[in-house]
């Protein structure tokens, strides 16, 4: 145990050292100042040339060649059709009507939302109509969270009230701290965050519709209290998970600091109440929080809305969302990018790596996106932010590999034709590493700001008259019917699926070898 604690302490000291170096350098240089803006003017001018979608309202005529019947399907102004309209198309052979088969929801919209707009072909991302580049340049995460939640940027007094409400809910119950401290010293921070979010449901029974009635969330006051609670407590829980990993006790939050400053304070103050993080370092983190705050119906947001549709409390719904974000295909991509860049090693190895990708022998992480078929607008901001950070602390050798890899890929027809551009994960991991965060903490840095997006969708779903408990259909492909037989009469085919060999520990083997008389 002593060696493990020593290792954790060494890792913690190393991380604090990197943070101290970065903080000292940032003290003399303003990140995101007017002299070197994140927002390049051409970004907005290019967006202004993209016209809003036209009115697509109309009708489709569907002719069923099985029966010769024709059906008229209404098309909404947004270009959608109701899936249930296809249920009326039947073969006349006692079927239940057509179902739409869409694995992965590639072309299915289960909700109508006004929170986030994405045009993947044009590389556009907007929160409530505001370009992400503009918000990253001029706003703060807390202000953006208000925008996502309530639809408009707050006035000065509204912002002050909002900041106060969030900061006043930043402390977590002692019982929750005890739960976190009881976890293994090497517990993955995302596992800690998922568990803690779920446990908050127990500590706040006043917010549970299962205990207080299904109409509980019809109260705007009740909703808003949960929003402030979660936004306030998320960084505190995340900091406790980080400190647990480093073998250190949790630190009380400070209500006098900004959102990002408070988070860094809890990580690095070592309990010194006079400690204050460098404001420029906090600004770097704040911009990253803005970029990760919302991204419409991604896997984890869809999970949050799916769970919330059952009427479950918001803490359980968000615990499920964070669990989805824990998946390596969703929240762990920037860690995969770092691993890839380390494997490439040097710029000289890039041509060989590129050929390996094209021959399907290697996998390129950080390129391509389910939605974007253009350069991810968040990646543009993050790359500029990375350049700022590395110009201050010195260039990590991997940034040279990353820049050269991007240049090689964007000059290769193989990637251009497939519209594989850098995404938000390509550079973010490099920034987090330079700031001293261990790779296992990267998805937590994704989850903290994404709470704002989850909560905005939760609030929106509560007011949406079309919200129903989510219950997707399936296409049954199993055996039609068979009858029960006693075990001794069953003939099992060798091709039948069966339990694989379950490994046991040596201690279990020792126990099984003993006498049972």
Region spans (language model):
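Hydrophobic alpha-helical bundle cores within soluble ligand-binding/oligomerization subdomains
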Residues: 2-5, 26, 40-517
């Amino acid at each position: 145990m002593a060696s493990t604690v020593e290792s954790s302490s060494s890792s913690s000291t190393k991380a604090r050292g990197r943070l101290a170096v970065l903080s000292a350098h940032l003290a003399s240089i303003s990140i995101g100042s007017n002299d070197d803006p994140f927002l390049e003017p051409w970004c907005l001018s290019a967006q202004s040339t993209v016209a809003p979608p036209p009115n697509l309202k109309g009708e489709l005529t569907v002719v069923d060649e099985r029966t010769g019947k024709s059906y008229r399907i209404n098309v909404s102004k947004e270009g959608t059709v109701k899936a249930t309209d296809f249920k009326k198309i039947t073969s006349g052979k006692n079927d239940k009507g057509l179902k739409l088969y869409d694995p992965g929801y590639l072309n299915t919209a289960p909700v109508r939302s006004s929170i986030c707009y994405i045009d993947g072909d044009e590389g556009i991302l907007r929160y409530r109509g505001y370009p992400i580049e503009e918000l990253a340049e001029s706003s703060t995460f807390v202000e953006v969270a208000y925008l996502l939640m309530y639809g408009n940027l707050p006035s000065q007094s509204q912002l002050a009230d909002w900041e106060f409400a969030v900061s006043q809910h930043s402390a977590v119950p002692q019982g929750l701290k005890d739960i976190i401290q009881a976890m293994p010293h090497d517990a993955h921070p995302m596992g800690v965050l998922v568990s803690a979010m779920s446990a908050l449901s127990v500590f706040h029974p006043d917010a549970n519709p299962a205990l207080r009635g299904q109409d509980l969330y019809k109260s705007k006051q009740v909703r808003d209290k949960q929003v402030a609670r979660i936004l306030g407590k998320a960084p505190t829980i995340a900091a406790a998970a980080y400190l647990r990993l480093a073998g250190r006790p949790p630190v009380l939050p400070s209500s006098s600091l900004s959102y990002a400053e408070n988070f860094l304070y809890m990580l690095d103050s070592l309990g010194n109440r006079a400690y204050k993080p460098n404001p420029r370092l906090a600004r770097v983190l704040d911009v990253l929080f803005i970029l990760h705050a919302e991204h419409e119906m991604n896997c984890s947001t869809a999970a949050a809305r799916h769970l919330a549709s059952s009427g479950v409390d918001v803490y359980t719904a968000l615990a499920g969302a964070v669990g989805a974000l824990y998946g390596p295909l969703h929240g762990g991509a920037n860690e995969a990018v770092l691993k890839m860049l380390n494997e490439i090693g040097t710029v000289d190895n890039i041509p060989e790596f590129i050929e390996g990708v094209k021959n399907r022998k290697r996998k390129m992480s950080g390129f391509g996106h389910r939605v974007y078929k253009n350069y991810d607008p968040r990646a543009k901001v993050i790359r500029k932010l990375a350049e700022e950070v590395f110009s201050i602390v010195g260039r990590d050798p991997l940034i040279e590999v990353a820049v050269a890899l991007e240049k090689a890929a964007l000059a290769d027809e193989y990637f251009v034709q497939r519209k594989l551009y850098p995404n938000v994960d390509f550079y973010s991991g490099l920034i987090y590493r330079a700031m001293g965060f261990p790779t296992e903490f990267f998805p937590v840095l994704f989850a903290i700001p994404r709470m704002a997006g989850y909560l905005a969708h939760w609030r929106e779903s509560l007011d949406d008259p079309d919200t129903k408990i989510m219950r997707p259909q399936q296409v049954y492909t199993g055996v039609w019917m068979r009858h029960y037989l006693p075990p001794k009469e069953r003939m099992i085919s060798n091709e039948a699926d069966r339990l694989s060999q379950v490994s046991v520990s040596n201690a279990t083997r020792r126990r099984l070898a003993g006498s049972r008389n």
